[in-house]
Amino acid sequence: PRETWFDGERLAAGYAVGVPADSPGAVGHVSCGVVARSLRAVVVDPETGEELPDGRVGEFWLHGPNVGRGYWGHPGETRRTFGATLAARLPHSRAEGVAPDTNWLRTGDLGMFFGGELYVTGRIVDLMFIDGRAVYPQGIEATAADASPLVRRGYVTAFTAPELVI
């Protein structure tokens, strides 16, 4: 695993662009390393089910002998989570060797491959939309902590609420 700094604006737009750590708007992420040989992992557009190229942010889908089969007694949730199929693959796909009709696990994790390593940027369910722009809660929390010495890092949380909370 390694730490890499990305252009925060481009990352929010779904593109991983590496920058120096001291660049304005740089956002640091630590990789999860490479994918185990027994596992296949692809980054997919969660709306279309199409595989995305390295450097694009999408949902991680997994396939392998160590992936569960489903949720006990919850067939609908099992189909939604463990029954995904790739709508389109890239040339030299990370799904190479996996049959086209194979079921994939939708992890709900967002991230990308960059430099051959896997980076997780957040969770789909945690993503917030402000003025039509996708925002990670961690970014809001870091901005609040950086805004004032009175706010301690790790003591701020951002989340959505069904109604306006003031």
Q: Which role fits each region the language model picked out?
A:
Residues 1, 55, 144-148:
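Hydrophobic, Leu/Ile/Phe/Ala-enriched alpha-helical segments that form helix-helix packing faces
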Residues 1-26, 40, 47-51:
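Gly/Ser/Thr-rich phosphate-binding loop
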Residues 7, 115, 122-123, 148, ...:
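Alpha-helix initiation/capping motif
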Residues 18, 86-90, 148-153:
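Alpha-helix termini
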Residues 29-42, 47-55, 59-130, 134:
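Conserved ATP-binding/catalytic segment of the ANL
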Residues 108-110, 127, 146-166:
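C-terminal boundary motif of the adenylate-forming
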Residues 133, 137-141:
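Generic alpha-helical secondary structure
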